[in-house]
A protein has these predicted regions:
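Cap/lid segment of the alpha/beta-hydrolase catalytic domain
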Residues: 84-101
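Membrane-interface motif at the C-terminal end of an N-terminal transmembrane signal
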Residues: 1-16, 20
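Alpha/beta-hydrolase
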Residues: 176-234
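Conserved HGGG/HGGXW glycine-rich cap/lid loop of the alpha/beta-hydrolase fold
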Residues: 38-87
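A catalytic-pocket lid/entrance helix-loop region that shapes and gates access to the active site
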Residues: 148-192
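Conserved acidic catalytic loop of the alpha/beta-hydrolase fold
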Residues: 102-122
Length: 234
């Protein structure tokens, strides 16, 4: 495995409860392409916590930094920009179609790299949204690599998820008497087996925006910095 280090003149240092926090950014060759990881820690001897973002394509470093950085007092936190996402989005990454199997292979390779780098036998994985699907799949395939798997926003059935989202935004629009929104949702039709019968991509994106608008993604949804970040993906 080839490792390329992203050189920074000095470690980024922040103070959380008077604890010095160090940050290392690395480019690691995974699955034949360079992929970026951000490692935050106070003590490299702490257990590893690998965080899997959602999407695919929604790296969550700003949210981890804002809400979860204190975990670095107890863990070596690793944020991975998955292929075609964030700092891992390159010309090379676009040459190979994304598949769940490819992402699982990338994850396995990254886990093995981290365990070797820090001389560990196991680590923790926390997955969110799409990352929760990927993390749970990894846990079922390779349990010996893990102490625990933690799922947040854990998906179980994408088919059920789509219909629940549609019903939520439709009911919210009806409560607000948003007739144009109601008619547009009706024109798309309720998803069947996870697929909208009319203009699936347009419908899925529209429903996603409405969920955010109606408070279904982030709580509280009046947080300016979080909303500004999240709006980039909607």
């Amino acid at each position: 495995m080839i490792i390329l280090t992203y050189n920074i003149p000095y470690n980024l240092i922040s103070f959380v409860n008077e604890v010095i926090m160090n940050t290392d950014e690395l480019y690691v060759t995974i699955g034949g392409i360079k992929q970026n990881i951000l490692i935050t820690y106070t003590d490299v001897n702490k257990p590893i916590l690998l965080i899997l973002h959602g999407g695919p394509g929604s790296p969550d470093r700003p949210l981890v930094n804002k809400y979860n950085n204190d975990l670095a007092e107890d863990f070596v936190i690793v944020c991975w920009d998955q292929r075609c996402s964030g700092l891992s989005f390159t010309k090379e990454s676009k040459k190979t179609p994304l598949t769940p199997e490819l992402m699982l292979s990338d994850l396995k390779e990254l886990v093995e790299f981290l365990l070797n780098k820090y001389s560990k036998e196991k680590l923790y994985i926390a997955g969110h949204s799409w990352g929760a699907y990927l993390g749970l799949w990894f846990a079922s395939k390779f349990p010996d690599y893990l102490y625990y798997y933690i799922g947040t926003g854990q998906g179980i059935s994408s088919t059920l998820d789509e219909i629940e989202k549609y019903n939520f935004v439709l009911s919210q629009a009806q409560k607000r008497n948003y007739e144009k929104v109601i008619q547009r949702l009706i024109s798309y039709g309720a998803p069947q087996s996870g697929i909208y019968p009319n203009s699936h991509n347009s419908a899925s994106n529209y429903v996603g925006k409405l969920i955010h608008k109606y408070g279904g993604y982030i709580h509280p949804n009046n947080d300016f910095s979080t909303n500004k970040y999240f709006s980039l993906y909607l």
